[in-house]
């Protein structure tokens, strides 16, 4: 985990270069949207809280949350890591708190940008769910808050000052429509013309944790390591030159339609795709690679301006 944190903090420039050179740049900036919320008054007690003790008891914290009346979340697709059930469970347990779901397909970077754009308004995200690369380089945007189970979280899985902590993980994998493309044994298979315009990372490597780690998977299989990201860059350049790489954002819709027929993504997402597509008569397969077991936690953080 320490090594991954160092990698995340030190290699964004290289991965950004990959995004522009291999995937092509996109001039659209989602953070440029004008502020749409109403100005709100900050609750000083809540803003200064660094742990449950500052509220009193859990009942006191719940009462404060119910008084506010709403929770703004972002980048929580219902089929991602079972977030749909988590959200429904929260609603049942705390019916007095309205959940406002924003941009479920936002990248980690777009989450933080939304907090900046909507700062001081009721449209700002209250909490973030972030890949390590963005979490570890964006701590100035987070509140220092240590959750109730803080002491049980390993030191290597949290920020020492309480800016963020890891909560769930998966293994990076490659998934594909086996009915259409047959078997895939290696990443070199994806250079075949039959995969024209259909191979996708789940997001942009410089912005999204899934895409960043998809890049690391390819880099590892291409002979690279934590200190050498060039082989991955070379691989994706070849994939682009072959006409097989697409920069379309991966969603249920693009997978259902076949627009993204091969996807680098976490195993828990692939399992969700497989289940949904099976109901539609599509055989979606996915695999991990023994020589490239890329694992990275996602992290929870609180918007310091929430």
Indicate where each model-derived feature is located.
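Short amphipathic alpha-helical segments
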Residues: 69-71, 172, 296-300
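Extracytoplasmic ligand-binding site segments that recognize negatively charged/polar headgroups
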Residues: 72-88, 100-116, 122-259
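N-terminal low-complexity, Pro/Thr/Ser-rich intrinsically disordered segments
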Residues: 33-68
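Extracytoplasmic/periplasmic substrate-recognition and gating elements
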Residues: 277-306
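Bacterial lipoprotein signal-peptidase II cleavage site
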Residues: 6, 19-36
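A ligand-binding cleft/hinge motif common to bilobed small-molecule-binding domains
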Residues: 134-139, 256, 262-282
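Sec-dependent bacterial lipoprotein signal peptides
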Residues: 1-21
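Short, polar/charged alpha-helical segment
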Residues: 55-66, 76-98
